[in-house]
Every structure is written in structure tokens, then in C-alpha cells.
């Protein structure tokens, strides 16, 4: 499947309404890897809470490339039907709160989306890894594959004993059976299906620890193949600094009792923020920290996307926009506001390919990442620094280990700012496309008491008729300067300013708070 096909239309056909009648509480995923055959054997148990006792059908997302050998419902064998992407169990009305479904299956996993399940090879040895986002966990294990149905998970991976097998959460046990070795990993915090991952390869391990502000410790691991190991360790060493900045900005690391780690995989597009175990593509491990922003971005996802998950894929910007802006916030915290401006300047664009909420072309375009970051930057200007940073911490605290929608974020933002932000959210998130595009001219004339400057601003964009926004204007005088803020509310606006001295130069939005272009027509 091409990435351009991963949109809300596809996802709407993949998930069914009846899935909301159930709530997954726990996955027990046992996978035996057969790399020479590029096949797997699976044994999965799912504990589900029944929300609607009248629902007769349990629909699990599970691609039909897998041969299902057995399905048990509460330890009784049941019949099931298959479609291309789903497995449906018809059940009698159950007067119970929870049910347990067990499935045994085998087959060759499909490679969809960003790859989903990969039998790869590096340096003459097998390398196996997964990447499920957004809806391809079900290419290799049965699940309810929607982001807001988080559950706890036990993941056991069996492979040849010469391989190290990795997953989310905390390592519980390693057991040997003949030439096979099984690694058992366990999550103590809820996880979305798309964030569950396995890696198995010839990994070497580097360990360090982070000591939090409250003196708690987080185990940090770097897993890389031998020829990239030293480079990976060098790229990984600054995670203590990144963690401290994000802890100060957002709150404590959300998976403190498990770990944070990076694992090398052979993905060509960059990195993937699997919960507690980010995958880093081989080409992005340099030993010279060339891709520091990417590593910072993936760590930020542990707060934004993993701990605070999206309620639906329509809300994907809450993952990617927040993590992209976190890159800029890191550089601001460590190097000053100019560093933030430099970071954001590299993330500008026209963004004319849809709205930020429910992007209609591609869930993973620059619109979602970069415009999402700019919208947070403009929101910061709109509500003020103090309120903005309190908002981030409280948004995280309120929704950690849960899921939030864009409307949830709007509601808490209005609560903390004590402002009606419907206009802001409509023009930048729900309805508006593109950016503010303007042309302007100005004239300055003397008066009895100084000078009067008239600035004429005209909005030109097609994606949204009239943006309303605060606009800083900087006046440069011979020996001084000043900044005044005006609120633009019309498509064609005239701003009149009286000053004691003649402005030598005028700059609109001098500190780059707006996702906007200002093209001067004439000046004096």
C-alpha cells in the first residue's frame, strides 16, 4: 500500500462501529520468528471488557494473510469469518463484564504502510522489526487497531538464541529452550496497538541512566548492530540533557518504571516513536549527531503521542505538531529564543493541502508536522507564555495514559486562558487551509506633535477568507526602536500610528510569531 492511500477514508473502512462495544484491557502476544522462511507463528490472548452486552459480533482487525488455526472464546472453540482486514466472531449474549479471546495462527506477514513487518538482513545476519503506524499492527497480530483503545501488554518473542529480541516496556525474563531463546517484555502503562513493536537482531547494548528532578531514575538503553554500535552510542549520549529539558517543560518522563531506548532498524524514512523503544534508521546513525532534531522529536513523542495519545487519526497533529514544536522548545531552552526562531524558520511552507485537523491527503505530510508546530507557536503568542507553559503541563497531566481529541485540547486551552478560542481553532485547525498571505504599504507624514504612519494591509490568501490575528509592528528610529501590537480583523486593514520620532524602517511581525508572508508594495 502506498503512503498516499493511508487516509481517513481507508481507516474508516478498516474499523467498524461495533468495536466500540468492547474495550481491550490486555494483550498477551507470543510470536515465534522463523526468519529463514520469513514467517511467524503467533499465540495471542486478548482480555476485553464488554461495554455493550447486546453486541453479537466481536470484530478484530487481522489481515487474511495469516492462517488462523484456532479461536477460543472463554476457552471454548468458536467459529469465525474473515474479510481482507478483519476477523469476526459471532457470540451469544454474554452476561459478564469481560471475555477472553485466544488465537493461534501462522503465516507470512504483509508489508503495508511504512513496512509493518520486515524480515531484513544486515552484515550477513537477519534483522527483524515492525512498524505499525497507523493501522498495520494487524498484519502480524490480531487486535482492535484504533489509537484510543489502549491496553496493557505482555510481548514474548522467540528466535534463534544468537539474537537479541526487544520490545516495549520492561524486560521480565529470558528463557532458553534448545537452540531457541524467548524474551518476555511487559508494559506497566497502557499502550496503543500501533506503538507495540518487536525488534530481533545481532544487537549490542549500551546502558546509562537518567536521574530525574525528583531523584528517580530512568533506565536508558541503546541497541545497535556491531558495525554501528559506537556511532549509535555517541548519538545517544545527550539523552540525559533532552530528558531534563522536557521534564522541566512538560512533567516527569511518562514511562519512568520501564525504560527509554533506541533500537537500530533498517527503515529509510528516519525514526519511529514506539513506546519506550524508538526505532532509528541505520542511515540516520552517524556518530556525529547530524540528526539531533529527529532524536529530540522522537523522545518528545513519549509525552505527545504515546502518553497522551490521539483520540482518532483525525487528531494526528496532536502527536506530530507537538513533537515538532518540542524540537524548537528544546533549542529555545538551551540556546535562547533566536534558536527557536531558526528551528521554526526551517519548517515553513504554504501548507495548502488541507486542514490541520483530519488532513485529507496524507496523515504524515509537512502540514501535520510543521504547520502543527507553527499553530502551537501562534497559540503561545495568543495566550501568553506563562499560560501556554502551564497549559502544556496540565494537558499532559490530565490526559497522560489516555487519549485526547483536538476538541479536548481546545477545551483545556480555553479553560486555562479564560478566552474563547473558537476563532483561533477554526482558522488554524478545523477550517483554514494554507497560511496568511498579505501585501502592504505605508506612508509616514509629519504632524505638529511628531509623525503619523498609515499602514495598509491586504490579505490575499485563498485557503481562508479573513484571518484575525495579533500583529506586532516594529519601528526603528534614529536612536531607538519600539514594538506595538495591533489586532488585524479585516481583509483590508488600515493601521494608523502616531510616533514622536520619524520611523526609519518598519517591520511587520519582527519576532516571527505568525505563519504569514508580508510583501511590501511601496515604502518611503
Which role does the model predict for each range below?
Residues 42, 133-135, 143-296, 325:
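Hydrophobic helix-coil surface modules that form long, contiguous segments used
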Residues 314-378, 382, 399:
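Acidic/His/Gly-enriched intrinsically disordered linker/tail segments
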Residues 1-43, 69, 74, 123-126, ...:
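N-terminal, polar/Ser/Thr-rich
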Residues 365-455:
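Amphipathic alpha-helical substructures
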Residues 237, 279-339, 392:
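Zinc-dependent metallopeptidase catalytic helix centered on the HExxH motif
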Residues 58, 63-122, 178-182, 492-502, ...:
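A surface-exposed beta-strand-loop module
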Residues 12-19, 95, 104-154, 201-209, ...:
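Glycine/proline-rich low-complexity spacer/linker segments in large multi-domain proteins
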Residues 67-73, 421-422, 435-438, 443-509:
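Beta-strand-rich binding/interaction modules
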Amino acid at each position: 500500500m502506498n503512503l498516499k492511500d493511508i487516509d481517513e477514508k481507508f481507516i474508516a473502512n478498516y474499523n467498524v462501529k461495533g468495536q466500540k462495544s468492547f474495550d481491550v484491557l490486555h494483550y498477551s502476544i507470543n510470536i515465534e520468528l522463523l526468519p529463514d522462511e520469513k514467517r511467524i507463528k503467533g499465540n495471542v490472548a486478548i482480555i476485553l471488557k464488554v461495554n455493550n452486552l447486546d453486541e453479537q459480533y466481536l470484530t478484530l482487525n487481522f489481515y487474511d494473510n495469516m492462517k488462523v488455526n484456532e479461536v477460543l472464546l472463554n476457552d471454548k472453540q468458536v467459529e469465525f469469518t474473515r474479510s481482507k482486514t478483519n476477523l469476526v466472531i459471532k457470540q451469544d449474549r454474554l452476561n459478564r463484564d469481560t471475555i477472553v479471546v485466544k488465537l493461534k495462527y501462522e503465516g507470512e506477514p504483509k508489508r503495508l504502510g511504512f513496512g509493518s513487518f520486515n524480515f531484513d538482513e544486515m552484515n550477513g545476519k537477519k534483522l527483524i522489526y515492525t512498524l505499525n503506524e497507523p493501522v498495520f499492527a494487524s498484519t502480524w497480530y490480531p487486535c482492535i487497531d484504533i489509537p484510543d483503545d489502549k491496553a496493557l501488554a505482555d510481548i514474548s518473542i522467540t528466535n534463534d538464541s544468537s539474537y537479541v529480541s526487544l520490545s516495549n516496556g520492561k524486560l521480565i525474563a529470558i528463557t532458553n529452550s534448545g537452540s531457541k531463546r524467548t524474551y518476555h517484555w511487559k508494559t506497566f502503562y497502557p499502550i496503543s496497538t500501533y506503538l507495540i513493536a518487536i525488534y530481533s537482531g545481532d544487537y549490542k547494548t549500551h546502558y546509562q541512566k537518567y536521574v530525574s528532578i525528583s531523584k528517580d531514575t530512568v533506565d536508558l538503553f541503546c541497541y545497535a548492530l556491531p558495525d554501528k554500535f559506537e556511532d549509535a552510542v555517541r548519538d545517544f549520549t545527550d539523552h540525559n540533557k533532552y530528558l531534563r529539558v522536557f521534564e522541566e517543560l512538560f512533567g516527569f518522563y511518562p514511562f519512568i518504571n520501564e525504560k527509554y531506548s533506541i533500537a537500530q532498524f533498517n527503515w529509510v524514512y528516519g525514526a519511529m516513536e514506539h513506546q519506550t523503544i524508538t526505532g532509528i534508521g541505520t542511515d540516520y546513525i552517524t556518530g556525529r549527531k547530524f540528526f539531533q532534531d529527529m532524536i529530540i522529536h522522537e523522545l518528545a513523542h513519549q509525552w505527545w503521542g504515546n502518553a497522551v495519545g490521539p483520540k482518532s487519526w483525525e487528531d494526528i497533529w496532536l502527536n506530530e505538531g507537538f513533537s515538532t514544536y518540542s524540537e524548537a522548545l528544546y533549542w529555545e531552552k538551551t540556546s535562547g529564543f533566536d534558536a527557536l526562531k531558526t528551528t521554526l524558520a526551517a519548517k515553513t511552507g504554504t501548507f495548502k493541502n488541507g486542514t490541520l485537523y483530519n488532513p485529507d491527503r496524507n496523515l504524515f505530510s509537512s502540514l501535520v508536522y510543521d504547520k502543527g508546530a507553527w499553530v502551537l507557536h501562534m497559540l503561545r503568542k495568543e495566550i501568553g507564555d506563562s499560560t501556554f507553559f502551564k497549559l502544556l503541563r496540565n494537558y499532559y497531566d490530565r490526559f497522560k495514559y489516555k487519549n485526547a481529541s483536538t476538541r479536548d485540547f481546545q477545551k483545556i486551552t480555553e479553560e486555562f486562558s479564560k478566552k474563547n478560542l473558537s476563532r483561533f481553532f477554526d482558522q488554524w485547525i478545523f477550517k483554514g487551509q494554507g497560511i496568511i498571505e498579505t501585501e502592504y504599504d505605508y506612508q509616514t507624514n509629519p504632524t505638529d506633535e511628531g509623525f503619523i504612519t498609515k499602514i495598509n494591509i491586504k490579505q490575499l490568501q485563498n485557503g481562508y477568507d479573513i484571518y484575525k490575528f495579533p500583529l506586532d509592528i516594529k519601528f526603528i528610529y534614529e536612536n531607538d526602536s519600539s514594538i506595538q501590537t495591533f489586532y488585524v480583523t479585516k481583509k483590508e486593514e488600515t493601521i494608523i500610528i502616531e510616533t514622536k520620532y520619524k520611523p526609519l524602517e518598519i517591520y511587520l511581525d519582527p519576532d516571527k510569531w505568525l505563519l504569514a508572508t508580508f510583501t511590501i508594495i511601496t515604502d518611503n
